[in-house]
Structures are given as structure tokens and as C-alpha cells.
């Protein structure tokens, strides 16, 4: 159930997802990155570094992690770290309005600094048009990162060239230098080999901790690995792989996936992939109306992808053939217009009135979905149940969020797979009760789809 264009324009992006503009906040450190030591989704072994009450898992890591490097590997070494510091900034003051991504980078940075490394940190910020723009400089990050690390963060106004070489030459063990926005060079997104070589020229080894851009083959995420060895995953990146890849590869059962959002077309691959592993798939959001129309039901003025009707039929047939329960809502909350203050009514999906549009799932559907989740041991959620940005139509999404928050302490692994569902659990106030909340948007989806992420594939194997 899509946001209006106006609402999208007034929203801001946080950790790969879009949320309504709110006052600046500080996210509890425990909700972001945690060092992950090993990585199989085997419940019989525990990782004690996670918060008490969480399901404990271990995942057999394929890629080498920064945790595999000790003091002997790091002391005095120049370590090029690619993080995701693409934080939202106030348009007028350029003050950071949400520091989640900075906090997520801290465990890796502290580990490197504590082991005597000379850290060269870089990121992208915003969408500069192939050259320096003051509003996209990483300068606002300096003060907050210094505060979180408890030490001075130095900065240079470039990411390659003489000024960087000079700054690196004077860097001491246990110090951090923040390089400028890599996207000030158009060669970054083109994965230009010469640019990658220049980025790598001032370092001895590489750490990628930017999961949000791991699905992009850019110079700072993929190209530099050809010139720096070892090239390893940071703690945040490793944790994302442990949960998102591990959940699909070897889940505790029953395994339930919740897939929401406005369009079937954007979730086709992930639904097909999840059908190979899931016991149940719950479908919500605007995409349900494409399924209903494919069944021959009237959907009023609800969102429908007319060219995906056959696809919806096929997905239901595949689920049946595989013995996977595909659950769609039995009732919906409809509105006479797409507006926060619209007139509403709750109706059966077989009785949607002409001219009305479905914007949330109904109470019967909520109960059905809660029953389906009751015995779940692994849950992956990607996409809201309705237009949760409007309070009238957030009931279904909030109910599902609360249900998952109750499952986690009972031993279930609850994974929020990026995108709007992250904003939804935060809005519901239960983010801290989930096993894992992904910091990636597109990267999360591609990993769940079973795709190879270039930024991960380029890293060294154990």
C-alpha cells in the first residue's frame, strides 16, 4: 500500500528504509551492531554476545571477518574501512537527525583501534552529481563519531590524492582518519579500477562494514579488494549475513515469512525463494489485491498490477504444489480515498465496495495471522501490512510487530528484513525486542532472494 508522492517527499531515509520525519533521536547502542564470532543457523550452540532473552544461534561463516584478525595482524597496519555513514541531515543546519548508521559502525571501528590499527574510514552520503557538494560532505559525522568512540576523529577533505597521503603518513596506531565522501568521484559508482587502486594505495588491508551498499559493485565496496589483502567483513556486515542468509539456509522450524508492501512485482523473487524454505508465507500490503483480482474478486479502487495477475495465480499454484501455506487476509479496512482522515469500513475481501480502496488488513485477518505465527521458531518480515504511516491504517502492521515481539523471548528468531518493516517496528516501539533488524534496504531483499552481493563475494573466504 504505497505512500503518496507527497508523503515520500516529506519522509527521510534511515538505514536503508524510509520513515516519517521525526525529531532527532538517539538509538540505543544495543539495537544496532553486535560482533558476531561465527556464523550456521544451528540453535544448539550459543553466541553469548547477544542480548539476554534472545534466541541464541551460531552461523558457520564463509567469509573472513574482522574478528578473525588479532593484534598481530592489525597493530600499525593501515586499514581501509568502508562503512555506511549515509545519515539523514537537517536540510538547513546539516545536523544529524538520526545517528543509527554511525552507531552501527562503532563495534568494528573500536575493535580495530583497540588493536592498534591506523583506520582510514570512508562512506558515501547522499547523491552528489559526480563532484564535491558541501551539503554531502561527511563533516557532520566527525563530532558524533568522536563522541561514540571516545577519541578524536581526524578528517581530510578528499578520499584520494596528496592531501590524503599526507594525512595518512602522520596517522599513529590507534587513530582514525575520516576520508571524504567517495561519491564525489563519479568513478566510485562506475567501479573504475584506477580509482579503486588510488583508494587502496594508502592502506594495507580492507574491511567492508557497509551492508547497505553490499549489493552494489562500486570501487569502495568491490574494486578495492583486488588491491588489498586480506579483505574481510566487519562485524555489522557479518551479523547481517548470519541472520539473513542463515535464516533462509537452515531455519529453525516452523519457518514463517511475512511479505508485505504495495507491489507483487517488487517481491516476486523473494516470495519464490522463500517458498523453497518456508512452512508458511503471510501476504499483506497492497499486493494482496492483485491476488484477489486474479481470483476473480472485485477490489474497488485498490492498487492492482494488471500485468501481474497471471503471476499471482502461479505463485498460489506453486505454494500449493510445494505444500507451503500461503495466507492472505480474509478481511480488509477500506477507505473512500487515500488520506489519513478518510472514511473507513471493515469488509470481507469478497465485499469490497466500488470506489473504495483497501489500506490495511482487518481484525479477522490479524487473528488468523497471529494464530499462524504462534508456533513459529523463525520469522522473517519484509514489508508492512498496510499504509502504516496513517494511524487509521497502522493497526495491522502494529499488531504483527507486537506479535513478533512476544515470540522472541519464547525462543523464536525474529528477523526484520529491512525496508519499511524496520520503520514499522520502530513506530510500534518494539524494535528492541526483535532478534535482528537489518540496516539494509535493497541489500536485505537481494540477500533474501538468494542473490550474490558483489560487496560480499569480493571478500576473502576463511
Curated annotation (Swiss-Prot):
Binding site for ATP: 267, 286, 358, 389, 420-421
Gene that produces this protein: PGK
Pathway: Carbohydrate biosynthesis; Calvin cycle
Reaction(s) catalysed (UniProt annotation): (2R)-3-phosphoglycerate + ATP = (2R)-3-phospho-glyceroyl phosphate + ADP
Organism name: Volvox carteri
Binding annotation for CDP: 261, 285, 383, 388
InterPro entries xref list: Phosphoglycerate_kinase, Phosphoglycerate_kinase_CS, Phosphoglycerate_kinase_N, Phosphoglycerate_kinase_sf
Subcellular location(s) per record: Plastid, Chloroplast
Protein name stated in the entry: Phosphoglycerate kinase, chloroplastic
PROSITE patterns the UniProt entry points to: PGLYCERATE_KINASE
Amino acid at each position: 500500500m504505497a505512500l503518496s508522492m507527497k508523503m515520500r517527499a516529506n519522509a527521510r531515509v534511515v538505514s536503508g528504509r524510509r520513515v516519517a520525519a521525526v525529531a532527532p533521536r538517539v538509538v540505543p547502542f544495543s539495537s544496532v551492531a553486535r560482533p558476531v564470532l561465527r556464523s550456521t543457523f544451528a540453535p544448539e550452540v550459543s553466541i553469548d554476545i547477544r542480548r539476554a532473552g534472545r534466541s541464541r544461534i551460531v552461523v558457520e561463516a564463509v567469509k573472513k571477518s574482522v574478528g578473525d584478525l588479532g593484534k598481530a595482524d592489525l597493530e600499525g597496519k593501515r586499514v581501509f574501512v568502508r562503512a555506511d555513514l549515509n545519515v539523514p541531515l537537517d536540510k538547513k543546519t546539516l545536523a544529524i537527525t538520526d545517528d543509527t548508521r554511525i552507531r552501527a559502525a562503532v563495534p568494528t571501528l573500536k575493535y580495530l583501534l583497540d588493536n592498534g590499527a591506523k583506520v582510514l574510514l570512508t562512506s558515501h552520503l547522499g547523491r552528489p552529481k559526480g563532484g564535491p557538494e558541501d551539503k554531502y560532505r561527511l563533516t557532520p559525522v566527525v563530532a558524533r563519531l568522536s563522541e561514540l568512540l571516545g577519541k578524536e576523529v581526524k578528517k581530510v577533505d578528499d578520499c584520494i590524492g596528496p592531501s590524503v597521503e599526507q594525512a595518512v603518513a602522520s596517522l599513529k596506531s590507534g587513530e582514525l582518519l575520516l576520508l571524504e565522501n567517495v561519491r564525489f568521484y563519479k568513478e566510485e559508482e562506475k567501479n573504475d579500477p584506477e580509482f579503486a587502486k588510488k583508494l587502496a594505495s594508502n592502506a594495507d588491508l580492507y574491511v567492508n562494514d557497509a551492508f547497505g551498499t553490499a549489493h552494489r559493485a562500486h570501487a569502495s565496496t568491490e574494486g578495492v579488494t583486488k588491491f588489498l589483502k586480506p579483505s574481510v567483513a566487519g562485524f555489522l556486515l557479518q551479523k547481517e549475513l548470519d541472520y539473513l542468509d542463515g535464516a533462509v539456509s537452515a531455519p529453525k522450524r516452523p519457518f514463517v515469512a511475512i511479505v508485505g508492501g504495495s507491489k507483487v512485482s517488487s517481491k516476486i523473487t523473494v516470495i519464490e525463494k522463500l517458498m523453497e524454505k518456508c512452512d508458511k508465507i503471510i501476504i499483506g500490503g497492497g499486493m494482496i489485491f492483485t491476488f484477489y483480482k486474479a481470483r476473480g474478486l472485485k477490489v474497488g479502487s485498490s492498487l492492482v498490477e494488471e500485468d501481474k495477475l497471471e503471476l499471482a495465480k502461479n505463485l498460489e499454484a506453486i505454494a500449493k504444489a510445494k505444500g507451503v501455506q500461503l495466507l492472505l487476509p480474509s478481511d480488509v479496512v477500506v477507505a473512500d480515498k487515500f488520506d489519513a482522515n478518510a472514511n473507513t469500513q471493515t469488509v470481507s475481501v469478497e465485499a469490497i465496495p466500488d470506489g473504495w480502496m483497501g489500506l490495511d488488513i482487518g481484525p479477522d485477518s490479524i487473528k488468523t495471522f497471529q494464530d499462524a505465527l504462534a508456533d513459529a521458531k523463525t520469522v522473517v518480515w519484509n514489508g508492512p501490512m498496510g499504509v502504516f504511516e496513517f494511524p487509521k491504517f497502522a493497526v495491522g502492521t502494529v499488531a504483527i510487530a507486537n506479535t513478533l515481539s512476544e515470540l522472541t523471548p519464547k525462543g523464536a528468531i525474529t528477523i526484520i528484513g529491512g525496508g519499511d518493516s524496520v520503520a514499522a517496528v520502530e513506530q510500534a516501539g518494539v524494535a528492541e525486542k526483535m532478534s535482528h533488524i537489518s540496516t539494509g534496504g535493497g541489500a536485505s531483499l537481494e540477500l533474501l532472494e538468494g542473490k550474490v552481493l558483489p560487496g560480499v563475494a569480493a571478500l576473502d573466504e576463511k
